[in-house]
């Protein structure tokens, strides 16, 4: 086991604080409408330019191990806030830095760290309650567009695109952001459920111009195994032919003789049919087939359930108003599933999202949820250069997350004003002086986001904050973009409550841990072994015979 270095008390906290400051100072320049850019060097390709706090935080790794521990703890604040609320990472970082700084001073002055932490927790709980009480619910599409615009650093078109996407697919619907091949940013909406598997043979196409297979009012057979011969399927195929309706087969694979037979029947005109592979792999494939079954009112033909292909009847097949299949995607529109069954499945997936600890699983579950809950919207981000597209995509992702958060818990005045107002309203008292000091730490820290926004805009923070607090109305604040004072909500400067709340809770949680740290342990840097001596030169005059 390698030797370790241990630091205690003040020297540990000083090192840690230096790491916190380095990371927070790099992140906080991006805050607000006049936030500056940060350029990040990449080991390959062009440098990346971003105003996204969490992207900056993720890039920072310090040489000194003790400083790096402080930096990584604050990076954790940014990541956690990003995971829960999807935005507010810079605000969380600024708050964490302010609480740690004030807390370190208090501990150095001889106060009890645990009492300080209790005081901080008391104040944060009161502020969260105040924020939720002040929240204004979001109802109209215009308000959704406003939130999107603010989070996209004032770019109105992004706000409008997000509002339109949410209007079309619902607040729970999936909205994905992709890089476009063109210079324009565009929005495409896919109604119904779409998955990324296309037809198994181009002979299934019904519209040769567009190379699409369209099936109207179709039956859907869901089979979890491979189909290599059709003998077992003949009874159900004959039943479908008699109804005169088309059939879509979704199976692990359809190959060899089975595929050839289907194609021949399709070409002879006896059977309107198409076959696609089931989406996903392994257990996820089973779950997605079950989703499709619930959406279309069918049953998955699975030997696990004791259902054999020979015994399948028409009422086990799913139904859909329209199925559209391209080379790459299948879209099922208006499935015949019961609304109550679909809602039950949605609730089940939501519960799984709450329980999962894996980011990848959570993302896949959210995709499944959205497909069930109503359609998919794709925002394709265009730009003149790759660097511009990546920067814009960052902003749209942020704006999308902020908008979702706003729809969930409502909005408060932006620009750091909500926290500023809450700082004045903290009335809670601790059990002793040290706890009161903890409450005061939060009171002072709540001013830091507003101050940073004003400083980034090149104005004098103390004067602006003083002017805002002179007025007693909750919505009165400072527009850093235009340099004017006024009603923040009327000016469209708003923050989702979920973002502000999460930023404060995560910042206070990690900052409290840092304040109560008394020892730090890190591995000693390894000393490199001395280099091998060079080989001896040939000796003069000693030629080989």
Swiss-Prot record:
Gene3D superfamilies: GroEL, GroEL-like equatorial domain, TCP-1-like chaperonin intermediate domain. One of its GO terms (biological process) is protein refolding. One of its GO terms (molecular function) is ATP-dependent protein folding chaperone. Its EC number is 5.6.1.7. ATP binds at residues 30-33, 51, 87-91, 415, 495. It comes from the Bacteria. It is found in: Cytoplasm. It catalyses: ATP + H2O + a folded polypeptide = ADP + phosphate + an unfolded polypeptide. Keywords: ATP-binding, Chaperone, Cytoplasm, Isomerase, Nucleotide-binding. InterPro entries: Chaperonin_Cpn60_CS (IPR018370), Cpn60/GroEL (IPR001844), Cpn60/GroEL/TCP-1 (IPR002423), GroEL-like_apical_dom_sf (IPR027409), GROEL-like_equatorial_sf (IPR027413), TCP-1-like_intermed_sf (IPR027410). GO terms for cellular component: cytoplasm. Together with its co-chaperonin GroES, plays an essential role in assisting protein folding. The GroEL-GroES system forms a nano-cage that allows encapsulation of the non-native substrate proteins and provides a physical environment optimized to promote and accelerate protein folding. Belongs to the chaperonin (HSP60) family. Forms a cylinder of 14 subunits composed of two heptameric rings stacked back-to-back. Interacts with the co-chaperonin GroES. This is Chaperonin GroEL 1. The lineage of its organism: Bacteria, Pseudomonadati, Pseudomonadota, Alphaproteobacteria, Hyphomicrobiales. The gene is groEL1.
């Amino acid at each position: 086991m390698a030797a370790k270095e241990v630091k205690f008390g003040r020297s540990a906290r000083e090192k840690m604080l230096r790491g916190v400051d380095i990371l927070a100072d790099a992140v906080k320049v991006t805050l607000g409408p006049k936030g500056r850019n940060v350029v990040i060097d990449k080991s390959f390709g062009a440098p990346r330019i971003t105003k996204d706090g969490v992207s900056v935080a993720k890039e920072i790794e310090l040489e000194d191990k003790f400083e790096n521990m402080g930096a990584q703890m604050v990076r954790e604040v940014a990541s956690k806030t990003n995971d829960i609320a999807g935005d507010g990472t810079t605000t969380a970082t600024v708050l964490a830095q302010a609480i740690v700084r004030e807390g370190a001073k208090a501990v150095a002055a001889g106060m009890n760290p645990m009492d300080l932490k209790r005081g901080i927790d008391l104040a944060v709980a009161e502020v969260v309650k105040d924020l939720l009480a002040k929240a204004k619910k979001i109802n109209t599409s215009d308000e959704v567009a406003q939130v999107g615009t603010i989070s996209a650093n004032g770019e109105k078109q992004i706000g409008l695109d997000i509002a339109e996407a949410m209007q079309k697919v619902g607040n729970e619907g999936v909205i994905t952001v992709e890089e476009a091949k063109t210079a324009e940013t565009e929005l495409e909406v896919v109604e119904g459920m779409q998955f990324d598997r296309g037809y198994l043979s181009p002979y299934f196409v019904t519209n040769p111009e567009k190379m699409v297979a369209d099936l109207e009012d179709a039956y859907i057979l869901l089979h979890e195994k491979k189909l290599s011969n059709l003998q077992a399927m003949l009874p159900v195929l004959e039943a479908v032919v008699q109804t005169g309706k088309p059939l879509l087969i979704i199976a692990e694979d359809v190959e060899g003789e089975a595929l050839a037979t289907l194609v021949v029947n399709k070409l002879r005109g006896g059977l309107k049919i198409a076959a696609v592979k089931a989406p996903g792999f392994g257990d996820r494939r089973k779950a997605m087939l079950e989703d499709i079954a619930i959406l279309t009112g069918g049953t998955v033909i699975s030997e696990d359930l004791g259902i054999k292909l020979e015994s399948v009847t028409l009422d086990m097949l799913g139904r859909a108003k329209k199925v559209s299949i391209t080379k790459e995607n299948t879209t099922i529109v208006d499935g015949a599933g019961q609304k109550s069954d679909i809602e039950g499945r949605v609730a089940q997936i939501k519960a799984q999202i709450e329980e999962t600890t894996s980011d990848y699983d959570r993302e896949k579950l959210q995709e499944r949820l959205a497909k069930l809950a109503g359609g998919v919207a794709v925002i394709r981000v265009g730009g003149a250069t790759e660097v511009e597209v990546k920067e814009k995509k960052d902003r749209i992702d942020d704006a999308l997350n902020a908008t979702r958060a706003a729809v969930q818990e409502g909005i408060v005045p932006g620009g750091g004003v909500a926290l500023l107002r809450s700082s004045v309203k903290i009335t809670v008292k601790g059990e002793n002086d040290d706890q009161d000091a903890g409450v005061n730490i939060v009171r002072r820290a709540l001013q830091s986001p507003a101050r940073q926004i004003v400083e980034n805009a090149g104005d004098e923070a103390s004067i602006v904050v003083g002017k805002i607090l002179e007025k007693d109305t909750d919505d009165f604040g400072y527009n850093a973009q235009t340099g004017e004072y006024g009603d923040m909500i009327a000016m469209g400067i708003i923050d989702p409550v979920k973002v502000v709340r999460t930023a404060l809770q995560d910042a206070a949680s990690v900052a409290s841990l840092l304040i109560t740290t008394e020892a730090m342990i890190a591995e000693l840097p390894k000393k490199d072994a001395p280099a091998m001596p060079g080989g001896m030169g040939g000796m003069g005059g000693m030629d080989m015979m």
